[in-house]
Amino acid sequence: MKIPVTVAPASRRKKLPGRRRYVLLLSFILCMVASSYAREAYKYKRIGGDLDAQAMADTGLAMMGGGTDLDEAFKWLCGKGHGGDFLIVRAHGSDDYNKYVNKICQMNSVATLIVPTRKAADEPRVAQIIRKATVIFIAGGDQSNYIKFWKGTLMGRALNDHVVAGKPIGGTSAGLAVLGQFVYGCMEDKANDPDLTSKEVMENPYNPRVTLLREFLQVPLLVNILTDSHFAKRDRMGRSLGFLARIVADGWSKDPREIAIDEKSALLVEADGRAKVVGPGQGVYFLQVTEPPEVCKPGQPLTFKNVSVYKAPAGARFDIRSWNGEGGEPYSLSVEAGEIHSSRTGGAVY
């Protein structure tokens, strides 16, 4: 049976006022934009198991100097996670690490979390993903983005909780730069700026681009320590000496230390602070301040003497707690009026 339907003549149909139609259309568009933005605020790409593993992790710290990724370092870091869930975090970029880590490690899952804004870093789901990870690796990129986007957010707190819980963590390049208590933040660098050079810093330790910060993360073994990467490859010794001088001159520490790692090198640190150096790069440089800088003032060349250095090549061992090593070479460096002088034969800095 057909049910008759009465349709009002066109002349009797009510039309929405033009202003109301405009408001409804605008509201619809804004809702769609907001929904799209919420979906794109962060990206999470995962391979492997859909359910999180209940793996017990061992404390470990994988500090990588950038350049070619080292299978040995990643396998060591994965081993600390005992088959749990491996999470890569970054502000921009791709999920290329997923396939790489999944190929060389036996993990329940490997995922990449890309968090490009503070709004995204304050999403509860982002913090939840981090809290469920067994192992976290901070990828390379631009450390100023990590600081601007993540510090003081739900994500930042979740990262620190991961460290406090004793779970394994690692980082390379910019990801290494934010592991120490003291951080060179690149906060004043523009997109196309070249690297801040050793010459620039030694000529003026208060160069506006020397932006130092504290406690992005609170890794217990890295208290009072500055971390840097691409070290010998990019000739960063002079700028590191300038950074350490600034830390003293600004009253942050009387005797700061630095762990500086060259490209294709890594430092694998156990829970008790004992570490080994791996990789074909020039290794790891452990710096320690022994006396305050004589001259560390705005617009003046740096004078800073007797900074102790321990160069640790692949195979060397170093105890971060006692600050002693074996298998490496100790020497000292001084800066006088912006020029480096080394105690090594031939005056070699690296």
Predicted regions and their residues:
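Short, low-complexity intrinsically disordered segments enriched in A/P/G/S/L with frequent Arg
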Residues: 10-12, 19-20
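Bacterial N-terminal signal peptides
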Residues: 24-33
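Sec/Tat signal peptide C-region and signal peptidase I cleavage site
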Residues: 34-38
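C-terminal and late-domain segments of enzyme folds
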Residues: 39-83, 189-350
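Short internal beta-strands
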Residues: 87-92
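Catalytic-core regions built around general acid/base machinery
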Residues: 129, 152-166
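Catalytic nucleophile loop
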Residues: 139-140, 163-183
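Glycine/threonine-rich flexible loop motifs
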Residues: 143-153
